[in-house]
């Protein structure tokens, strides 16, 4: 009799994705981040669900309800710290996952890559609306500043902003709808993840050497299920350490003050994982231009497959392109640093140079160097 996991309509899908999936035998730990992102999503949904049981999305009680969760709910402080720092780990894994894709040419699976960029945008939106919920100073002013960017849209901008606010400023209606969105989006992300996996399993994973691996595949279980399990243990240990020993390390002290529309914080800035995009936004001394640059900083990932000029897939055997990749990593770190700095000399010019370099690397330098490497190989 055939095995149930190979015949049952539902188990067959899980089996083809997690047990009998033919996997390249040489994929490294850089291929662990997909499953780690899945773990992050599950952990965020679970901790978020328990937080939502005690949270109230009303401006008069939101801040107090979060304090109540931390003080009075059994292990509420732990659930909240895991949820807040879990978001940071989510983005760490996201950035490493995208970096892996850029380094090893995974973006040549265009459908998988484009769904991935959409997922990235969805997770960013989820994190943004979630940051507003504790209704601290930085929650309120972050929401005000970022939603205000929509007023740069020609003709309909102001109407659009008031429509999102549900009034003439960030107020009760805004908080209520942001809570609704924050509850909904993770499930949309989970659905999009299924599509992401569906497209990935049409082609199979790429691998570190960038060659066809059909001749050398192994079953996903037990080899990579155990390898993923090791990644899970490492990440959960790191998350627990952060949540228990340094729970407020990555947060903003301003968010311990209840939201006050009458007092603007001296430096309005988003969470650390948005600082690179925020720096690009601030580098352009024009509202619409800044908003377009902000959008482009993420959407530029969509054009990476179109601008691939090299005959080789990954950067494993392309030292010149490797150099550009690591310059991009350094540039992202510089932008992250600048995003958290006040708008004054010399930070303004550093941010502008870093922003120009960011787009140049994607749109000009990488395709150019790929083309040059082809020439050198033929020579």
From Swiss-Prot:
It holds the Pfam family Cytochrom_B_C. GO terms for cellular component: mitochondrial inner membrane; respiratory chain complex III. A ubiquinone binds at residue 201. GO terms for molecular function: metal ion binding; ubiquinol-cytochrome-c reductase activity. It is found in: Mitochondrion inner membrane. Binds 2 heme b groups non-covalently. The keyword Iron applies. It is a multi-pass membrane protein. Its cofactor is heme b. Keywords: Electron transport, Heme, Iron, Membrane, Metal-binding, Mitochondrion, Mitochondrion inner membrane, Respiratory chain, Transmembrane, Transmembrane helix, Transport, Ubiquinone. The cytochrome bc1 complex contains 3 respiratory subunits (MT-CYB, CYC1 and UQCRFS1), 2 core proteins (UQCRC1 and UQCRC2) and probably 6 low-molecular weight proteins. Belongs to the cytochrome b family. PANTHER family: CYTOCHROME B. Component of the ubiquinol-cytochrome c reductase complex (complex III or cytochrome b-c1 complex) that is part of the mitochondrial respiratory chain. The b-c1 complex mediates electron transfer from ubiquinol to cytochrome c. Contributes to the generation of a proton gradient across the mitochondrial membrane that is then used for ATP synthesis. This is Cytochrome b. It comes from Anguilla dieffenbachii (New Zealand longfin eel).
